[in-house]
Amino acid sequence: MGEDRLVEIPRSDWEEWRDLYKRDWPRHEIAFNLVQNYINWSKHDRKIKDLVLYSLNGSWRENGTFVIIDRIDLYMHTLDESLDTLRRALELVDWDYYYVAVMCEHEALLFDTFKKLNVRVGIGRANTVYFLPKEEALKFNVTVPAGLRLGSLEPGHAKIITDLWPHRERGSEFSIERLVRWNPSMGLFDEQGNLLGWCLLTQPGVMGSLGVIEQRKGYGKLVVMAFAKKLAEMGRNLYASILVENEPSKALFGGLGFKPIKDVNWIRNRERKFVEWSVEPYLAALGIS
């Protein structure tokens, strides 16, 4: 048996690769959505900078295991119940760099990898994934108050969203603008076109970055309902990843019928050399040293 290595999955194979995750639907729907996202994005840019989609030894057909690195975002998934191929793949990632393991379902495996490779954890953010079938979202009755309108976001809104996003860090504005440009979105606007509320669709097909200019006006609920219905009309089931301590968001989504389905973690490692993206400013802003 040869030495393990990470092998990029060719663009010509992405549709076949995506379809592996149709089994036991919708168990692997988020992985399906993630691959479909990059299929869609490849039509905008055939060579997206700082994006690599890896399998272990080119074995994705056998086990559905992948590690995707998109700038600082790191995604992982496997159909291998033993997790062996995912473990071996994670041990080959260059952890000298700072990554955010997005919606990680394999927290124990990742922490074991960090321990083995002497990688320090920056921070972990426990989340709960909420789910709503598209059939339920299609029933939403979206009523827009007089003087307001709903519509897609524009690239120029990225700075406003970034400035008000509590989890922003270096590179966030670019990442948010890319989502606005290439994915569906929803904004709430006043008569002058000023942005009042917003929600984005992230790479795994999860509703994210929900925000409003003013609290306690019902803007967040209106945006979520409108966006969920829009996505359902596109044939999508609805997902949201919510911090376990974010009681207002849990109440909002729960009140609309979203149900918690699994626990995940957003895990940041500490980089081990001077790099463009660093976790240290983010930790400093949180008062963590």
Regions found by a protein language model. Give the residues of each.
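Conserved beta-strand-loop-alpha-helix junction that forms the acyl-donor binding cleft
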Residues: A101-L109, K230, A240-G254, K259, ...
